[in-house]
């Protein structure tokens, strides 16, 4: 199974002790996900992040409703966490979120290893562009959210 890699970095003008807690709240993912995906966290509150935590979502990809379940496999506040898809739209989705203090703010890095259903052809036709578009939206929202905070 061929894996594909996606990486993104974003510097936020806020300290890590303010940025990481935002990511610690699973429901904030709804705010960071483009509206066209109709993303919804299904796991009841409160969601306490820890290794082994399972989180269920509902999402629409190209109009097709999909349930997605991830597991938090690494939880190391305030430095990093890793979520891995157990069921959902991918054969593999392994997402490492890293937070580093830099230049008076926080460098947020996303490293994703993934393998879409349909393999390289689907990645080339749809998936890569979708992932890039989703992360661009996410970065724009994060800049809006953390630029407003005082």
What is each model feature region?
Residues 1-50:
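Hydrophobic ligand-binding cavity/cleft-lining segments
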Residues 5-7, 65-69, 91-95:
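Short, surface-exposed coil-to-beta transition loops
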Residues 9-13, 40, 58, 71, ...:
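Generic structural detector for well-ordered beta-strands
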Residues 12-14, 61-63, 89, 114-116:
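Beta-strand elements of well-folded, non-transmembrane domains
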Residues 19-23, 29, 55-57, 72, ...:
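Hydrophobic pocket/interface hotspot
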Residues 40-87, 107, 144-149:
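Glycine-rich portal/gate segments that line the openings of hydrophobic small-molecule binding cavities
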Residues 82-133:
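Beta-strand/loop substructures that line and gate deep hydrophobic ligand-binding cavities in soluble
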Residues 133-141:
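A non-catalytic, amphipathic alpha-helix used as a structural packing/dimerization or gating element
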């Amino acid at each position: 199974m061929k894996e594909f890699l996606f990486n993104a970095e974003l510097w936020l003008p806020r300290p890590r002790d303010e940025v990481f807690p935002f990511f610690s709240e699973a429901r904030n993912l709804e705010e960071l996900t483009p509206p066209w995906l109709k993303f919804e966290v299904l796991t009841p509150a409160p969601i306490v992040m820890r290794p082994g935590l399972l989180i269920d979502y509902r999402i629409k990809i190209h109009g097709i409703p999909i349930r997605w379940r991830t597991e938090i496999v690494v939880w190391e506040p305030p430095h990093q966490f890793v979520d891995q898809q157990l069921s959902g739209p991918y054969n593999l989705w392994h997402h490492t979120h890293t937070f580093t203090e830099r230049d008076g703010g926080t460098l947020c890095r996303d490293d994703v290893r993934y393998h879409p259903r349909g393999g390289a052809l689907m990645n080339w036709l749809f998936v890569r562009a979708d992932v890039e578009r989703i992360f661009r939206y996410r970065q724009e929202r994060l800049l809006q959210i953390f630029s407003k905070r005082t």
